[in-house]
A protein has these predicted regions:
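Juxtamembrane helix-loop-helix connectors linking adjacent transmembrane helices
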Residues: 29-41, 66-137, 144-145, 149
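Hydrophobic alpha-helical transmembrane segments
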Residues: 7-11, 15, 43-44, 81-88, ...
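N-terminal, membrane-interfacial amphipathic/helix-forming hydrophobic leader that caps
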Residues: 1-76
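Membrane-interface helix-cap regions at the ends of transmembrane helices
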Residues: 60, 104-107, 165-170
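Membrane-interface helix/loop boundary segments of multi-pass membrane proteins
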Residues: 134-159, 163-166
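Aromatic-anchored segments of alpha-helical transmembrane domains
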Residues: 17-23, 92-97, 161-170
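Hydrophobic transmembrane-helix microenvironments that flank and shape a buried ionizable site
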Residues: 6, 18, 43, 131-133, ...
Length: 170
């Protein structure tokens, strides 16, 4: 693999991230136009973003990078019950510990139930789950492994980390 191809593949993976996000947001916006509640649209956008990115990256890995998804750090997907339990209990334990450890008045946001649902659905489904899922596939999956194949593990760890930081500054 040439340096040019490794760099090109890395930027193509970031482009796939952007395109997946734009398509997901566009489709979710279309649902909003037909009066689907905003909170539901946020969940749709998150699911579409993660799903589209996976499908596009899988096609990219097979056709362009010519590596199986497992070689890019993305083996067959399987969810174990203990991780579902951990995903539910961990935030609850952190929040509970916080409430027990720190005193003070509870301040209400005065938001309606709909506003709370809209805010939480965007924060959890899109920003919390989908964005993290896609960013890991792109930066720690495709980019890290393509650069590791071309150079070495040190460069493969440092370069995606810098790119990741740069993308978040934008």
């Amino acid at each position: 693999m040439s340096t040019k191809k490794a760099i090109g593949d890395s930027f193509a993976a970031i482009f796939i991230l952007l395109i997946s996000q734009l398509i997901a947001q566009g489709i979710a916006t279309a649902f909003g136009l037909i009066k689907v509640p905003s909170g539901v649209c946020n969940i749709i956008a998150g699911a579409l973003y993660a799903g589209l990115a996976y499908v596009f990256l899988k096609a990219f890995a097979g056709k362009i990078v010519k590596l199986p998804m497992a070689d890019l750090g993305m083996p067959e997907f399987a969810v174990k019950k203990r991780w579902i339990l951990t995903a539910v209990l961990l935030p609850s334990l952190v929040k509970g510990s916080y409430l027990l450890a720190f005193s003070g008045p509870y301040v209400s946001s005065n938001m309606s139930g709909t506003q709370i649902f809209n805010t939480l659905s965007a924060g959890i489904a899109f920003t919390g789950i989908a964005a993290g899922f896609v960013e890991e596939m792109v930066f720690r999956g495709v980019i890290l492994n393509v650069l590791k194949k071309k150079w070495n593990i040190k460069a493969a760890v440092i370069v995606p980390s810098i790119l990741f930081g740069f993308v978040h500054i934008l």
